[in-house]
Regions:
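Short beta-strand->loop micro-motif that forms the acidic, two-metal-ion catalytic signature
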Residues: 43-46
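Catalytic core of pol beta-like nucleotidyltransferases
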Residues: 1-24, 32-38, 49-136
Length: 136
């Protein structure tokens, strides 16, 4: 369930008006939480049907800053490392969803990828622990 944040509607409207193919929008970080402070930025991640070019992310972040009066950290989910994506999926809020199946499939894929990463890391860390050194 999404907790309503006073700037969610403005953020959603701005993003969906400026970019096509938006499947989901996530708010994460301290904004909208008990940890939010007046100087907190707003962390937003978008899931689009395509990878969004960097210049469009920068332009949209600037537009959002003007509209909200707050610093905005805008990210394309498809360009983020799995360690950040899993935090967004598990701890963030999906504030907009135009393609529920696509968003849930992406979230599930992210969680599966993170589990695989941890399994691989476990073997590496176990090997380091047994050898008591990282190199050679």
């Amino acid at each position: 369930m999404t907790k309503k944040y006073h700037l969610d509607s403005l953020i959603i409207e701005t993003i969906t008006t400026k970019l096509s193919g938006i499947q989901a929008i996530y708010r994460y970080g301290s904004a909208g939480s008990i940890y939010e402070r007046p100087e907190s930025d707003i962390d937003i991640a978008i899931l689009a049907a395509h990878i969004v070019p960097y210049y469009k992310i920068i332009n949209l972040a600037s537009t959002l800053m003007g509209a909200t009066g707050r610093d905005i950290d805008l990210q394309d989910m498809q360009k983020l490392p799995v360690t950040l994506r899993v935090q967004i999926v598990l701890q963030g809020e999906r504030i907009y969803c135009a393609a529920r199946v696509a968003a849930e499939t992406y979230d599930s894929h992210t969680l599966s990828e993170y589990v695989r990463l941890n399994e691989e890391r476990h073997l590496i860390l176990k090997d380091i622990q047994q050898r008591e050194r990282i190199y050679g």
